[in-house]
Swiss-Prot record:
It is an enzyme of class 6 (ligase). The lineage of its organism: Bacteria, Bacillati, Bacillota, Clostridia, Eubacteriales. Disulfide bonds: none annotated. GO terms for molecular function: ligase activity. Its EC number is 6.-.-.-. This is Putative cysteine ligase BshC. InterPro entries: Bacillithiol_biosynth_BshC, CC_BshC, Rossmann-like_BshC. It comes from the Bacteria. Residues 462-484 form a coiled coil.
Length: 547
């Protein structure tokens, strides 16, 4: 297994950020990648002594042990729990990332975010001499079930979709308030039927079957799998719906503070959005005039809180609050409240001494608008570090690249042009030239006769022209048939090019489409261990991972 560095595949604002273009970097309080900036942030976090380190550490240590039990790892050492315990130390720091709770861990990039988080935490701990804990924030409060409900696998020469169903009575429920689907066993059997047989499969099969009943919902199913996969490397998983979390000192007052500062938050976001627009990019987040930055849990459903005159109302429900009523609820019952895409990172950084946040390209574009949002809450946005970006190139695909003198850079734009070149090189008949010459000769032979007939009789001249068109059409029909037979003879080449595209760029970057487990079952834990060796210095690039 080996890495090769190539140009970043991030585009738009995120692409400009990883390439350190000054006009985009200026939107962020810290430059990337700048170890001195990370060290400065670490010193600032250490000087801030109001984080609920001890209480949060206790909650997270207990949660890592629960995840170990769910995954069948009870009795073994639990490095994630050990790391959670280290968070209680007075000078501890955190590197944070997060993602939705995707089915069977979702797309590959979820794993790459977690791996980057572990790597960066290890690097910063070595530099600062302080405990630096890698934390993965599961987006259990998100209510977009469609986004997490399916994964894609490559089966032969086609992509298959594995889906879990939702319960009709759980519409708009947060993922963390949903129960496991009744037909999860059916989903698992479909998943298993498309996975390779290997020596690494049985332990995972046992885990997947065990998780049909233990977790409380899809969020814990996801968290338990991620814990088994990366807990041994110290990844600490945080669920914002964890019992007791919103009662922690900094968390309990957070929602009331958001309501009290909503005007400043809205103005800060507007400034950030306008800056992005002036640079020629499309903002990823904008808010309507009545929208706040919070949701409210009502009868299980996660509903947006909207301004309504001097008070508030819930979208999709006939429920209103006065300002004082909502502020009182936020103080007394913070569990009723949930952040949105703007305030989620603020809550995260109220709880954790975040030294850096590991972000995907979409998140980078979001954070570009948030600097003044943080300031509105008296906070500073952490350094934003791009996640590891990877394409896995298996041996048989690498051989095809070599055979046809293709590079990875050829693949995203499509290989049709290169395929035509290959087919043309195999065209010993010279089909194009042959039929162009034939058509030219037919026209040369016909046209003098057509012209003489037209001079003799216009009506017969029209008939002669139609006759020429029919002859040309027959020649072109013959050309199509000859080309079709040529393509049949070249089908192996077509299949090879199709295979390269399906494996490396199936209509989008591989990391955004496929799941980790087909690769993990083929290559075992060495796959993860090699990913954990990816150089942090390469985060501004794309990595080709040959295995």
């Amino acid at each position: 297994m080996s890495f090769e560095r190539t140009g970043s595949i991030f585009s738009g604002l995120a692409g400009a950020y990883v390439q350190r273009e000054a006009h985009v970097v200026s939107l962020f309080p810290y430059a990337f990648p700048d170890e001195n900036a990370l060290a400065l942030r670490a010193r600032r976090m250490t000087a801030t002594d109001s984080y609920p380190r001890s209480e949060l550490s206790s909650l997270l240590e207990g949660y890592q042990r629960r995840l170990a039990d769910l995954a069948g790892l009870e009795g073994s050492s639990n490095r994630a729990a050990d790391q959670a315990r280290r968070l209680a130390e007075a000078n501890s720091l955190a590197v944070v990332t997060g993602q939705q709770a995707g089915l069977f861990t979702g797309p590959l990039y979820t794993i790459y975010k977690a791996v980057t988080c572990i790597n960066l935490a290890k690097r910063l701990e070595a530099k600062t001499g302080q405990p630096v804990i890698p934390v993965f924030w599961v987006a259990s409060e998100d209510h977009d079930f469609e986004e997490i409900s399916h994964i894609k696998l490559l089966q032969g020469e086609k992509t298959v979709v594995i889906t879990m169903t939702s319960r009709p009575d759980e519409d708009r429920f947060a993922i963390g308030h949903r129960t496991l689907p009744e037909d999860l066993a059916v989903t698992l059997e479909s998943f298993l039927s498309h996975l390779p047989q290997s020596e690494h499969r049985l332990p995972w099969e046992e885990t997947w079957h065990r998780l049909l009943t233990g977790p409380t919902g899809p969020h814990e199913h996801f968290a338990a799998l991620l814990h088994k996969l990366l807990g041994p490397y110290g990844l600490v998983i945080l669920d914002p719906l964890l019992s007791g979390l919103k009662q922690l000192p900094r968390c309990a007052s957070f929602f009331a503070s958001v309501l009290e500062n909503e005007v400043s938050l809205r103005e800060g976001l507007s400034r950030g959005v306008e800056q992005i627009r002036r640079l020629g990019y499309t903002p990823q987040v904008e808010k309507g005039p009545e929208e706040t930055s919070l949701f409210y849990f009502h009868q299980g459903r996660r509903l947006a809180i909207l301004r309504d005159g001097r008070g508030y109302r819930l979208r999709g429900a006939e429920i209103t609050f006065s300002r004082d009523e909502l502020l009182d609820l936020a103080q007394r019952q913070p569990d009723l409240f949930s952040t949105n895409v703007v305030t989620r990172p603020l809550l995260q950084d109220q709880l954790l001494p975040t030294t850096a946040y590991v972000a995907g390209p979409g998140e980078i574009a979001y954070f570009a608008a948030y600097r003044d949002v943080y300031r509105a809450m008296g906070m500073e946005m952490p350094p934003i570090v791009p996640r590891l970006s990877v394409t896995i190139i298996e041996g048989f695909v690498d051989k095809l690249l070599e055979r046809y003198a293709l590079s990875f850079a050829d693949v995203p734009a499509g290989l049709e042009g290169r395929l035509r070149e290959e087919l043309a090189a195999q065209d010993e008949l010279g089909i194009g030239a042959l039929f162009e010459e034939l058509e030219s000769q037919v026209r040369a032979a016909y046209l003098p006769a057509v012209e003489r007939i037209a001079r003799w009789d216009r009506q017969m001249g029209n008939l002669a022209e139609e006759n020429l068109d029919r002859v040309i059409a027959q020649a072109r029909f013959l050309r199509q048939k000859v080309e079709h037979r040529h393509r049949q003879r070249c089908q192996d080449k077509r299949n090879h090019f199709r295979k390269v595209e399906l494996h490396l760029w199936p209509g989008a970057p591989q990391e955004r489409v496929y799941n980790i487990f087909p690769y993990l079952l083929k290559y075992g834990s060495s796959l993860i261990e090699t990913l954990l060796e990816a150089p942090v210095e390469w985060l501004d690039s794309h990595c080709l991972f040959r295995c």
